[in-house]
Amino acid sequence: GPAIDVLCQAIEMIQPDAYVDLGDVGEWGAFSAWKWKRKTKPPLEFIVPELEQDVEDVNKGMDIIDEALDKAKCPERHFCEGNHDNWLNMFVDAHPYLKQYRFDKAVKLADRGYTYHPMGKRLKMGKLYFYHGNQYGGQYHAANHIRKLGCNIMYGHWHDLQQHSATHVDGPKSAWSIGCLKDMAEESNTWLQNRAINWAHAFAVVDFYNNGLFTVHVVQIINGRTSLWGELIDGN
């Protein structure tokens, strides 16, 4: 969609030294336990074609971003596994003979050149940590992350934009929730049952300086458009 197109144009413009995907690279509806909550689950052979379609679709989406990273010659790539991604691992736990659906295998992370950070594991760059974001929630989840982790942390999961700062004896720290890039159309999110949401399309540009210090520039995308470094990026 347009938000992903904006991200790809930004990657080519920024020429980043590293790229971090914060996870939930797909909705993974076919693997969801919720899918069979109100109906009888059919035999496995009837489910597999849908699983295959999900894997194919998500890989195509990742190919689009990887193409931009390749063009920008981005040498370092990280993937922080999300809770939706982890549904694939849970499926393999239930069906151990279908190991090809384990998340990192299904999306070929190693072949794509990504370092894989399993769900809940944090990636550290300079004085900033990254992970999916599902461990601490609530209305003020950025404040909750700072309170529980006590470090600079950047995450996704909650789909909205928040920043909260705190100071400790060793200096100030912040938590950033940097939105999402998912399809926010009503028909793609029927599970919300028409609930109003505060989700936002966004990504972040992080610059690192000496001694692990860094600055964060959160770039919000509105209706498939944003402005970065004085340039309009239109993904429509």
Language model segments and positions:
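Core catalytic region of metal-dependent phosphoesterases/phosphodiesterases
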Residues: 1-110
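A generic local structural motif
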Residues: 5-7, 64, 116-122, 138-143
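Alpha-helical hydrophobic/aromatic positions enriched in membrane-embedded helices and signal peptides
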Residues: 16, 74, 118, 124, ...
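Short C-terminal domain-edge/linker segments immediately following a structured domain
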Residues: 18-25, 50-54, 108-113, 157-166, ...
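Acidic carboxylate-rich catalytic motifs and surrounding loops in phosphoryl-/glycosyl-chemistry enzymes
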Residues: 76-83, 117-121, 217-221
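Active-site-proximal loop/helix segment associated with metal-binding centers of metalloenzymes
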Residues: 93-126, 158, 177-185
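Conserved beta-sheet core of the metallophosphoesterase superfamily
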Residues: 125-219
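A short C-terminal boundary segment appended to hydrolase-like catalytic domains
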Residues: 208-236
